[in-house]
């Protein structure tokens, strides 16, 4: 067992090593024009609400009861983050230590359920014409937000020069919740059959990793924007990866 003083020295040495690694693999991070912690929180909330909305709408479309809709919303919103934390060795996952994201997910699901319950005509064929467009937008926003959050989480705990890990964690954080949602709805995961999806996450994660040593806030914003733009363009113009018909 290490004494408190030895623990303090060890943590200080690790922090110094971490800063040296950041200087070695990039430049010193410039002073952010935005409070990074606040930016991360805002992006997490945006992603949580967007993914919770997409999960809830799938549940409503599948005629699930209120509990089913809530479960779909929560698992879509936090599923990717749980997988990320397990990969990074964060135990227990942040979802269980800070339940605010589950609370936002439940609130989002309940609001959508009540709206659709009262306005049942919103589920008719004319309203459903817009369903796919709304789903694409919500999914793109959630995908972009959680992709950069995944990269930032791994970066902050010291995996600065593990580029493949940063990419993997960014993508799995972005697509994990959607995969869980689709499997719970007994659908082939969106990532495997629809227009370019994981590739959009991969591109945004790459931009975020490339710019992270220079300016963390800007790298996260630009990375998320890249994901959203690519995903929406891919859905609009039907960009697909090759497959056997």
What are the residue ranges of the model-derived segments?
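Structural signature of hydrophobic alpha-helical transmembrane segments
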Residues: 37-48, 97-107, 162-173
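Long hydrophobic alpha-helical segments typical of transmembrane helices together
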Residues: 214-245
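Transmembrane alpha-helical segments of multi-pass membrane transport proteins and ion-pumping complexes
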Residues: 48-56, 77-78, 82-86, 105-118, ...
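Helix-coil boundary and interhelical linker segments in multi-pass alpha-helical membrane proteins
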Residues: 34-39, 86-96, 151-165, 210-218
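N-terminal topogenic module of multi-pass integral membrane proteins
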Residues: 33-91
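Interhelical loops and loop-helix junctions of multi-pass membrane transporters/channels
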Residues: 90-100, 117-142, 151-163
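Loop-to-transmembrane alpha-helix initiation sites
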Residues: 97-102, 162, 193-201, 215-224
């Amino acid at each position: 067992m290490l004494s408190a003083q030895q623990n303090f020295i060890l943590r200080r040495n690790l922090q110094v090593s971490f800063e040296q690694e950041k200087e070695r693999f990039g430049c010193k991070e410039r002073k952010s024009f935005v409070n990074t912690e606040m930016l991360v929180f805002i992006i997490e909330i945006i992603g949580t609400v967007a993914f919770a909305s997409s999960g809830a709408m799938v549940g409503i479309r599948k005629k699930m009861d209120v509990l089913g809709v809530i479960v779909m919303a929560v698992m879509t919103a936090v599923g990717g983050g749980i997988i990320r934390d397990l990969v990074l060795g964060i135990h227990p996952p942040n979802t269980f230590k800070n339940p605010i994201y589950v609370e936002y997910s439940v609130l989002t699901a309940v609001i959508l359920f009540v709206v659709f319950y009262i306005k049942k005509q919103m589920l008719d064929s004319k309203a459903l014409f817009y369903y796919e467009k709304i789903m694409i937008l919500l999914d793109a926003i959630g995908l972009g937000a959680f992709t950069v959050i995944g990269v930032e989480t791994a970066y902050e705990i010291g995996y600065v020069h593990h580029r493949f890990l940063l990419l993997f964690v960014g993508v799995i954080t972005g697509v994990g919740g959607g995969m869980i949602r689709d499997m719970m709805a007994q659908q082939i995961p969106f990532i495997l059959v629809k227009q370019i999806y994981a590739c959009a996450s991969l591109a945004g994660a790459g931009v975020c990793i490339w710019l992270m040593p220079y300016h963390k806030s800007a790298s996260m914003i630009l990375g998320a924007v890249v994901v959203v733009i690519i995903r929406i363009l891919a859905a609009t113009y039907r960009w697909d990866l090759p497959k056997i018909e």
